[in-house]
Amino acid sequence: MLLRSGTAFGGLLLGGCDRLSRSPTFEGILASADSLTYRVQRLLVGNALAREFTPAELSPVFRSNGTDDPDTDEYNALRENGFVDWRLMIGGLVARPLALSLAQLRALPQRTQITRHDCVEGWSAIGKWSGVPLGTVLDLAQPSPAARFIVLYCADELEEGDGGYYESIDLIDAYHPQTLLAYALNDKPLAVGNGAPLRLRV
């Protein structure tokens, strides 16, 4: 009886959550709480830098993270010609939409940092990342004052036929000095397993 009652209560709770999630008032409360969370986080952490390490502390192996071989026709064609035809496309709420090649990105001011990657899967590794600060590229595109977030579309597929993986970050994180569009890991061009041709490091 206890199990059945608990199951029924859980069903009611979930049903209530579903109704709440469709309520404009409840959505407003959640949005306010989300905004407050961001403000408190920024107040406590600010623009603090992540710890940087020495070359002697580099991990001997830097595992693949995510899809280690995006096996799509488009990606394979780009990989076969060394990503010469690949472009970083920037659009949306910007004054200047951009299509930047790897050569153009490499011509921008570079930053190198030795930082630790802490994966949600429970492993970590220290790597030397080189690339262009994301803020530098965003400044070229001139985001609109209305822009608050950026959405990044990746070569990784979520699941067969489900489309590409994407992620988003706010502009505060995008402009953090250590947020990097990395094209090299440990002084070598990014390998496919590490996100070639370009990986965002936040």
Positions of PLM-derived features:
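N-terminal export signals
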Residues: 1-20
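Structured, non-membrane catalytic/scaffold regions adjacent to prosthetic-group chemistry
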Residues: 20-202
